Design a protein with these regions (language model features):
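P-loop NTPase motor core
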Residues: 1-65
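Conserved GTP-binding G-domain of TRAFAC-class P-loop NTPases and closely related GTPase folds
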Residues: 43-131
Length: 131
């Protein structure tokens, strides 16, 4: 918001660069550090053909950088019908045609998993260690 009165394209180029730098910081961390980015999502499609992606500032980051492409694992949090009138909160593990999500083949058997980050980290560690 500090640059809200600034006109021109440069501020968006700066924001895009800063955003990309932030996402790439994970590559410089120790292997034992677990870094989880969370974000809001936005519908870049329409009401009939929705396409939910990571929300960004402006089109530069989403169209030129594609933030999801900088990650090996992308989970999409969803509320899905549970028992009766109850909703269950789950993570989508791979794209379903409307939501962006991705994990390596064979990491998760189910499309929806429990909303449990500790369990996800455990599964990722086991997968990467070849267990």
């Amino acid at each position: 918001m500090d640059r809200r009165t600034e006109t021109g394209f440069q501020k968006f180029a700066d924001i895009g660069g800063d955003f990309t730098d932030l996402l790439r910081v994970a590559d410089s961390l120790r292997d034992d550090v677990k870094l989880i980015f969370t974000s809001h999502s936005e519908n870049t499609g329409d009401a009939i053909n929705p396409h939910w992606t990571l929300k960004t500032v402006g089109k530069l980051v989403s169209e030129k950088v594609t933030p999801e492409g900088l990650f090996t694992y992308v989970f999409y949090a969803m509320a899905v019908p549970g028992d009766g009138d109850r909703m269950d909160y789950k993570f989508l593990t791979n794209a379903d045609g409307e939501h962006v999500a991705k994990t390596p083949m064979g990491m998760f058997e189910d499309l929806y998993i429990d909303n449990d980050l500790a369990k996800i980290i455990e599964v990722i560690d086991e997968y990467n260690e070849g267990e």
